[in-house]
UniProtKB/Swiss-Prot annotation:
GTP binds at G12, P13, V14, G15, S16, G17, K18, T19. This is Urease accessory protein UreG. Facilitates the functional incorporation of the urease nickel metallocenter. This process requires GTP hydrolysis, probably effectuated by UreG. The lineage of its organism: Bacteria, Pseudomonadati, Pseudomonadota, Gammaproteobacteria, Alteromonadales. It holds the Pfam family cobW. GO terms for molecular function: GTP binding; GTPase activity; nickel cation binding. InterPro entries: CobW/HypB/UreG_nucleotide-bd, P-loop_NTPase, UreG. The gene is ureG. Belongs to the SIMIBI class G3E GTPase family. UreG subfamily.
Amino acid sequence: MKKQVLRIGVGGPVGSGKTALLRQLCLSLRDKYNMAVVTNDIYTREDAEFLTKNDALAADRIIGVETGGCPHTAIREDASMNLAAIDELQARHNDLDFVLVESGGDNLSATFSPELSDLTIYVIDVSAGDKIPRKGGPGITKSDLLIINKIDVANLVGASLEVMDADTKKMRGDKPFIFSNMKTQQGLADIISFIEKEGMLSL
């Protein structure tokens, strides 16, 4: 019987660094785990092509889903295209350990269907300003892990990491969050530890 593959949803607004995170996760984990990726773009397969061109994973381990119209629907109300892509990846590669499912660029109110994602990671970035965490929305408050990316630009945009830290704690309670910079891999080890622990991959 085919084992149930761990599905990790990665969401967040356009430009927050979702694809850069996926690339770093692939480069760091591909030799340790049997993994694959599904990306969602509205009219193109741009993110899937980026990962392939940047040698993140072999091309047959990446499927780009063209959602058309509203990208929220493909990860929430009708996840059938994404579920079919996961089935296809499982058919290609026996005993996958996990699949990363990247949502199309979405807003703070988008969430993954429980049937599509066992663990949800939500990525926001500092360049949008330090008010983003307190705006709330399911991505900020309910994701299993919140990543606050691009901390290197905080001074450039006048954002306070201290304010973001305090607001995020207020909005998330005990739920974890990590400050990161994918260019320098800052925070990456903590993100990987979270995935391994919560996904029970290291057992």
